[in-house]
C-alpha cells in the first residue's frame, strides 16, 4: 500500500499561475489546448466566483497566511511602494513574524512541505522571508516577481528593470540553468522533490508557482507554431468567440452584458504588419499556457507514479487577472526594452525578446469582466480557479463567492488541523470552503459579509450583490476614457460585467459601501498614498 494511503490525512498540491486570463483554459471557454487541466476540472469542481488581489505578491501573501496582505507586511509590492508607505507597519515588503504560514502550520503538524517556482514574498536583501524560513522543507524559488523564462537575465548587464533575477534552492543562492524553460524547469524540480521523498511516509504539501504566462512572452518555438494561425482575426473576434463558448458552457448567461473594451487600438486600425506582430504575441502567450498545461500533466503523472494521486487534493488558481499593461510603451520597462530587447517579428517568444499582450488581448481574456490586472474591477480580481481530487465533488461547479484567503483555512480543515489562532499570531480572515468543495454547502461566506481590496491607489468593496470600486489615475495611461479617482457602483447580480455605474442613481447605497471600505482601511492599517 502506498504510504500516503496508509493514513487518513490528504496530500495537497496547490498550483498558482501568473497573470492568466479567466477564460484561457478550454474548460472556461478558451481555444487554447489544456487537456490535463480540463481532466482535473472534470474530476473536480469549477470555481467560477473565486477572487484574489489585483496584483501577484499581495495575492500570494493572502494565500500563504489566510490574512489580509496589509496585516502581514505586504501592504503593497516593494516595486511600487510609495514614500508615505515606506517604514510603516504592514509595508515591510516581506511576510512578517506576526503570522503563521500554511506551510509552517502543515509542517508542524507532520506534513512534508515543498515548493517550486515564484516566491515574491520578500524580494529585498537580506531576504528576511524565504521559503525554508517560512515552512518549506524543500524549495527552488525565484525571489522576485518576474524573470526571463530562459534564465537570460541573471547578470547586471542582462537584468531588466528589476535587476538580475535571484534564485534560491532551500534558501541557498543558486543559478537558473541558462536555456532551460521556466515552466518545465519548475515542474521538474517539484517532481524531483517527489522522488527524493519516495520513502517518506509523511503526508505532503506541494506548492507549484509557475511564472507563466507572465511577461515577457516567451515559449518554445515548436509550441508557438501550433498557434500562429489562431489569432489573425484580432482580440475583438477572439473575445466574441470566447463569450459564445462561455454561454454554451453555462459560464455566462445569455443576458450577461460584457464590459466595454477600453484602451489600445482597434484591430481594423492596425496595419497588416502591426496585426501580424500582435497575432504572434498572442500565439506565444497561448504556447505559454499550453506548456503550463503540459507541465501540470507531468506533475500529475508524478503523483500517479508515487501512488499518491488518489489521496491528493489539488487547488488551482491564477494570482490575478491578465495583464493589460503594454510594457513596450510603459515606464519603467519601455526604455529597457528599447535598449536591450530584440523584438523583431521572428524573434518574439525567444530568450532575447520582451513583449506583452497589451489591453485588447487582456480584455478578450477577462471577458465578460471589466478591465484586468492591477485594478479592483472584476477583470482584475476574479480569476480562473478549480479544485480536484480527494474531498472534492466530481463534475461539479460552484458559483459561491470565494477568496484566496480561504485556501489556507480550507487546507487546515481537510488535514484535520485546528484552525484556531496560534499564540502571538494573527487570526485568519479567510474561512474554510471544504463544504463548497465537497458539495455539502452552496455558500461559504455570509451574503452581507464585507469583502474589500486596496492596492496601488485602487480600492474596492463588496457588500452582498453590490460592489464599489475606485480606479487610480494610472488607468488613464492605458484607457483615458475610463472614469478614475471617483467611486463607481455596480450590482454584480444584475451586471457582472460592471457595465452600468449606479453611483448617481443609488447615492445612499454607494455611501454605505464607501463607509465600509474606510472601516476596512482603518482595521487593516491601509496607508493611502498622497494623491490617491
Enumerate the language-model features and the residues they cover.
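Formylglycine-dependent sulfatase
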Residues: 1-483, 487, 496-522, 526-532
Amino acid at each position: 500500500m502506498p504510504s500516503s494511503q496508509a493514513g487518513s490525512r490528504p496530500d495537497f498540491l496547490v498550483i498558482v499561475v501568473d497573470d492568466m486570463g479567466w477564460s484561457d483554459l478550454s474548460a472556461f471557454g478558451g481555444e487554447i489546448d489544456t487537456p490535463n487541466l480540463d481532466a482535473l476540472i472534470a474530476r473536480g469542481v469549477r470555481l467560477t466566483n473565486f477572487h484574489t488581489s489585483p496584483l501577484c505578491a499581495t495575492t500570494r501573501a493572502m494565500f500563504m497566511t489566510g490574512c489580509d496582505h496589509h496585516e502581514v507586511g505586504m501592504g503593497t509590492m516593494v516595486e511600487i511602494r510609495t514614500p508615505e508607505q515606506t517604514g510603516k507597519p504592514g509595508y515591510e515588503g516581506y511576510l512578517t513574524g506576526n503570522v503563521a504560514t500554511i506551510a509552517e502550520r502543515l509542517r508542524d503538524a507532520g506534513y512534508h512541505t515543498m515548493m517550486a517556482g515564484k516566491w515574491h514574498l520578500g524580494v529585498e536583501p537580506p531576504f528576511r522571508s524565504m521559503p525554508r524560513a517560512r515552512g518549506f522543507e524543500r524549495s527552488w524559488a525565484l525571489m522576485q516577481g518576474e524573470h526571463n523564462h530562459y534564465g537570460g537575465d541573471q547578470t547586471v548587464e542582462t537584468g531588466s528593470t528589476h535587476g538580475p533575477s535571484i534564485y534560491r534552492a532551500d534558501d541557498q543562492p543558486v543559478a537558473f540553468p541558462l536555456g532551460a524553460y521556466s515552466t518545465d524547469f519548475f515542474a521538474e524540480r517539484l517532481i524531483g522533490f517527489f522522488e527524493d521523498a519516495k520513502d517518506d511516509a509523511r503526508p505532503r504539501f506541494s506548492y507549484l508557482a509557475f511564472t507563466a504566462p507572465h511577461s515577457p512572452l516567451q515559449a518554445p518555438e515548436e509550441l508557438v507554431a501550433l498557434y500562429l494561425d489562431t489569432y489573425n482575426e484580432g482580440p475583438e473576434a477572439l473575445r466574441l468567440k470566447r463569450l459564445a463558448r462561455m454561454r454554451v458552457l453555462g459560464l455566462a448567461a445569455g443576458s450577461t452584458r460584457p464590459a466595454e473594451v477600453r484602451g489600445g487600438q482597434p484591430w481594423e486600425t492596425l496595419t497588416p504588419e502591426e496585426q501580424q506582430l500582435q497575432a504572434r504575441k498572442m500565439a506565444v502567450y497561448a504556447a505559454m499556457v499550453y506548456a503550463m498545461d503540459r507541465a501540470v500533466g507531468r506533475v500529475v503523472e508524478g503523483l500517479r507514479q508515487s501512488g499518491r494521486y488518489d489521496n491528493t487534493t489539488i487547488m488551482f488558481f491564477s494570482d490575478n487577472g491578465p495583464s493589460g499593461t503594454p510594457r513596450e510603451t510603459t515606464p519603467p520597462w519601455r526604455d529597457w526594452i528599447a535598449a536591450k530587447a530584440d523584438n523583431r517579428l521572428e524573434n518574439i517568444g525567444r530568450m532575447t525578446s520582451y513583449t506583452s499582450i497589451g489591453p485588447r488581448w487582456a480584455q478578450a481574456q477577462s471577458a465578460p469582466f471589466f478591465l484586468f490586472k492591477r485594478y479592483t474591477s472584476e477583470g482584475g480580481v476574479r480569476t480562473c480557479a478549480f479544485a480536484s481530487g480527494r474531498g472534492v465533488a466530481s463534475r461539479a461547479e460552484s458559483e459561491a463567492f470565494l477568496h484566496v484567503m480561504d485556501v489556507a483555512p480550507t487546507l487546515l480543515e481537510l488535514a484535520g488541523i485546528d484552525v484556531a489562532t496560534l499564540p502571538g499570531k494573527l487570526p485568519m480572515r479567510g474561512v474554510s470552503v471544504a463544504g463548497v468543495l465537497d458539495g455539502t454547502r452552496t455558500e461559504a461566506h455570509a451574503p452581507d459579509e464585507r469583502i474589500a481590496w486596496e492596492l496601488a491607489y485602487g480600492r474596492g468593496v463588496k457588500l452582498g450583490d453590490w460592489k464599489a470600486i475606485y480606479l487610480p489615475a494610472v488607468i488613464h495611461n492605458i484607457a483615458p476614457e475610463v472614469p478614475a479617482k471617483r467611486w463607481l457602483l455596480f450590482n454584480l447580480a444584475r451586471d457582472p460585467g460592471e457595465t452600468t455605474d449606479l453611483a448617481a442613481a443609488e447615492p445612499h447605497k454607494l455611501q454605505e459601501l464607501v463607509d465600509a471600505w474606510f472601516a476596512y482601511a482603518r482595521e487593516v492599517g491601509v496607508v493611502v498614498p498622497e494623491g490617491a
